[in-house]
From Swiss-Prot:
PROSITE patterns linked to this entry: PX
Subcellular location: Cytoplasm, Cytosol; Preautophagosomal structure membrane; Endosome membrane
Region spans: Disordered: 1-111
Family statement: Belongs to the sorting nexin family.
Domain remarks in the Swiss-Prot or TrEMBL record: The PX domain binds phosphatidylinositol 3-phosphate which is necessary for peripheral membrane localization to the perivacuolar punctate structures.
Predominant localisation class: cytoplasm
Taxonomic placement: Eukaryota, Fungi, Dikarya, Ascomycota, Saccharomycotina
Species of origin: Debaryomyces hansenii (strain ATCC 36239 / CBS 767 / BCRC 21394 / JCM 1990 / NBRC 0083 / IGC 2968) (Yeast)
Coiled-coil annotated spans: 300-329, 494-529
Entry keywords, A to Z: Autophagy, Coiled coil, Cytoplasm, Endosome, Lipid-binding, Membrane, Protein transport, Transport
UniProt feature, compositional bias: Polar residues: 1-11
Residue ranges, compositional bias (Basic and acidic residues): 12-27, 35-54
Protein's recorded name: Sorting nexin-4
Length: 582
């Protein structure tokens, strides 16, 4: 059967299906859009099946009709002839399977609006594991009405209450495992950064210090709150298991091994070592390794970003990041001065207390009279009152320094890290766009080469036969010479040319298919950044900065208000003493 007959039979099958097929395809598209965050595995399987069944070349009227279908950019697999013969039966099977899923599961947006998950990380506690090694665990308190979390939890819903409060303890390794799982499942989503592991702390023994633990506590709490505010990450099943108090979390963590690229893991069953890799991790690591080199080798015309919205977002992120870094430097210097002042006032208070002790000791040795004793006791009391006020002043400076160092500065650093995370996602989109432009250049080059080879495929010229050349033998000889000299026919002396043309045609087909796939990926990623990831980050960042600044203002107000009240009381006592001396 020729290719024309194959595509004609496909056209007849589509004509027989008529509008019913279009309705079914539209239903399947709705399912795909609604369940894109919950049924990723099923979508990949359906897309692969559809890709293997869709013909490579479609008539013009079919292209117009398929613009609204979800398979508009699908390509023909290598076994296209076999799949084309079964396209009708497979498509019908796909639609029959897809139709019952219409009302099974609501979309992630509707679940985000209907249900809420509020998680707070508090109460760090030092504990020992099975091997008697110390670690810090953090208390997760979850208030939610989400059915998935309630189903996994052992806490039962009370009558008259819509929200269930669930508590569970997690250590830093659990947060790291959650981060790795979400990164692998959603590589196109902005992932909130975790606090650094700070391996050097293990060398100095400061991993269990109050300062280090509180800083990590605030960062982990911010990490979880970002996930709860995200429409995709908050609906992830692994996150629901993480916040629940189910005993399956430890089992799931032990059994699921997230492989890393370039790391050898021993296979106990086979008795040898094998290189394990994950597709997403492999792609990300390869991008990180080759990004600098490829960008250096790529022509400068491909490095320019043309999307105005992406440019505006990048410019805003850059300016905000620079401002946050400046604020961090300013408050770090200011906080260091606060710490120095607290130490100075503490030393000043100790010296005043020593003066009161010296005054009492000198009075006891001189044996003064009764009026003198009362006056000297009042002097010692005044020294103690002034020393206590200085000590109160020092404690307030110390508390303010502690809040700025463990909470406010950590929030500024975390906001800067979140900007870097979103910038990395934009950089990934830009690199994908560069790859697409390079593929387009390769396609244009291949087409020009094919056109150059195809230009020689012309009919042989008609030989000129005259009667002056000496008869029919000479004319026949001249005809053969002219025919052999042209070498323009596709059947004589053109096997090498045919091989080149075939290779170029196959290369062009592969490039066109890859460009169609990459174009859709770049378009989806760009729309996701502009319409979802950036607005979600912007909302979260505004809330975090507002809460941080409000917390700093409250601490400053309480600090100065306490100083005013304390020094006002001290001032009244000292003025009263001056009046008595007069």
């Amino acid at each position: 059967m020729s290719s024309d007959d194959q595509f004609t039979s496909i056209q007849w099958d589509r004509d027989e299906l008529g509008p019913n097929k279009e309705t079914k395809v539209n239903k399947q598209e709705t399912i795909t859009e609604d369940d894109e965050h919950h049924n990723n595995d099923n979508e990949d399987k359906d897309n692969d099946t559809t890709k293997s069944n869709e013909p490579e070349n479609i008539q013009e009227d079919d292209e117009t009709k398929d613009d609204n279908e979800p398979t508009d950019s699908l390509i023909l697999s290598k076994t296209g002839d076999e799949n084309i013969s079964n396209i009708e039966s497979q498509n019908e099977g796909d639609h029959i399977v897809g139709e019952p899923d219409v009302n099974q599961e609501p979309s992630s947006d509707s679940q985000t609006e209907a249900y809420e998950i509020n998680v707070v990380v508090t109460s760090p506690l030092r504990d020992l594991d099975s091997s008697s090694k110390p670690y810090i665990s953090y208390l997760l308190t979850t208030a939610t009405n989400h059915p998935s979390v309630m189903k996994l939890s052992t806490v039962k819903k009370e009558q008259g209450k819509e929200v269930v409060e669930i508590t569970a303890r997690r250590r830093y390794g659990d947060f790291r495992f959650l981060f790795d799982c979400l990164s692998n499942d959603h590589p196109e989503v902005m992932m909130p950064p975790l606090p650094s592991k700070s391996n050097f702390k293990y060398l100095t023994g400061d991993t269990f210090s109050t300062e280090f633990v509180h800083k990590r506590l605030h960062s982990l709490d911010r990490f979880v709150r970002f996930i709860t505010c995200h429409k995709v990450l908050s609906q992830s099943s692994i996150f629901h298991l993480f916040v629940s108090d189910s005993a399956d979390w430890s089992t799931f963590q032990k059994n699921l091994k997230i492989s890393k690229v370039g790391v050898q893991e021993s296979d106990a069953d086979k008795g040898n070592s094998s290189m394990t890799s994950n597709v997403v991790n492999k792609v990300v690591n390869e991008d990180l390794l080759t990004e600098t080199i490829m960008n250096f080798l790529t022509p400068s015309k491909h490095k320019r970003e043309t999307n105005k919205e992406i440019l505006e977002i990048s410019d805003k992120l850059k300016k905000l990041y620079e401002n946050l870094i400046k604020l961090d430097k300013i408050f770090t210097k200011l906080n260091k001065k606060n710490h120095d002042l607290s130490v100075d006032y503490e030393q000043f208070s100790q010296q005043i207390m020593k003066l009161s002790v010296i005054q009492n000791s000198s009075d006891e040795t001189n044996e003064p009279t009764t009026p003198e004793i009362n006056e000297q006791k009042q002097f010692a009391t005044n020294f103690k009152v002034f020393a206590s006020s200085l000590s109160y002043f020092s404690d307030n400076w110390s508390n303010l320094h502690k809040y700025i160092d463990e909470s406010f500065l950590v929030s500024l650093k975390d906001c800067a890290k979140y900007i870097i995370s979103l910038t990395n996602l934009i950089e990934l989109q830009h690199n994908k766009k560069i790859d697409l432009q390079v593929l387009q250049d390769y396609l244009n080059k291949a087409k020009s080469e094919l056109q150059g080879l195809g230009g020689s495929h012309n009919a042989p010229p008609n030989p000129i036969i005259t009667h002056n050349n000496g008869g029919i033998v000479n004319n026949t000889t001249q005809l053969i010479r002219d025919t052999l000299s042209t070498s323009a026919t596709p059947n004589i002396g053109s096997s090498v040319t045919e091989s080149k043309v075939t290779k170029l045609q196959n290369r062009i087909t592969e490039l066109e298919n890859e460009i169609s796939v990459q174009s859709q990926l770049v378009l989806d990623l760009t729309n996701k950044i502009i319409n979802e990831e950036y607005p979600n980050w912007d909302k979260f960042n505004k809330i975090e900065l507002k809460e941080s600044l409000l917390g700093l203002c409250n601490e400053e107000i309480s600090f100065y208000k306490g100083l005013v009240d304390n020094w006002s009381d001290i001032e009244l006592k000292l003025l009263k003493r001056l009046d008595e001396l007069k």
